[in-house]
Amino acid sequence: MNKKLKVAIIGPGNIGTDLMIKIMRHGEHLEMGAMVGIDPQSDGLARAQRMGVATTHEGVEGLTRLPVFADIDIVFDATSAGAHVRNDAFLRSLKPNIRMVDLTPAAIGPYCIPVVNGAAHDEALNVNMVTCGGQATIPMVAAVSRVAKVHYGEIIASISSKSAGPGTRANIDEFTETTSKAIEAVGGAAKGKAIIILNPAEPPLIMRDTVYCLSELVDEDEIAASVAQMAADVQKYVPGYRLKQKVQFDIIPASRPINIPGVGQRMSGLKTSVFLEVEGAAHYLPAYAGNLDIMTSAAKTTAERMAARILSAA
């Protein structure tokens, strides 16, 4: 099967440009059709043009006026949560069955973490890629929850300030809300919480993530094995994803329960701590921007699976 589906990317910033380069270099069932922006002076649009990709600086309206629009099957949206709602409604009014891969926290469609629930959404018209922190940490919550009932999952995503563009900064609140909900909906925790830290250190540090899960008491070796397997599965599409150290365990006895702010319960059980780092592939972005690389890699993986399904049905 060497036929490919044409895709458009809305948002020629860091994420959009990195995604474009990944598709052009490594697209299996995908090929670039158009890059869409709103700033005629955009570096990303200029780069796309130099690489032979059709461009428009007139937003999604401009996309629909491009000759290639008739052949576009999948659209990646790397703008902002508010813009995605409008973009989806506008494009769907013209092409009801167009596939949208949402890299914003808008979450119109189901949350998609490829390694956890990607196969369940091959047919979805709109999928949400949660957030960079969600893509890195929710697999670990899911790894614990497939072994034990998780009462509470908390993630802390620390990213280089330099890797956080205007889109990331404009969506901080949406980041925490969307990630928290996805920890529950996809990760399987009864209650989830997400924290993001923009680290201004120079030279920039690569993405680091901490995952805490409070679960029922089970065999610690089972959880450690599940976490290791999940990390290996994520590495298939994000090679720079790795455990920073061994999984840590603490038993919290019922005689000395803890209170978790926001949950408000006296809780006991097994506390699992997972420490991760994510190094980017440096296709376009620097290696320290693992937070952006994991989003573009997850989005491409999801779209490749969608495209394979569409092509096999054709």
Swiss-Prot record:
Pfam families associated with the record: AcetDehyd-dimer
Residues at which NAD(+) binds: S163, A164, G165, P166, G167, T168, R169, A170, N171, N291
Gene Ontology terms for molecular function: acetaldehyde dehydrogenase (acetylating) activity; NAD binding
CDD domains: ALDH_C
Reactions the enzyme catalyzes: acetaldehyde + NAD(+) + CoA = acetyl-CoA + NADH + H(+)
First-level EC class: oxidoreductase
EC numbers on record: 1.2.1.10
Active site positions: C132
Membrane-spanning ranges: none
Any GO BP annotation: catabolic process
Domain of life: Bacteria
UniProt entry keywords in alphabetical sequence: Aromatic hydrocarbons catabolism, NAD, Oxidoreductase
Listed HAMAP family: Ac_ald_DH_ac
Entry similarity comment: Belongs to the acetaldehyde dehydrogenase family.
Record-given protein name: Acetaldehyde dehydrogenase 3
Species whose genome carries this gene: Dechloromonas aromatica (strain RCB)
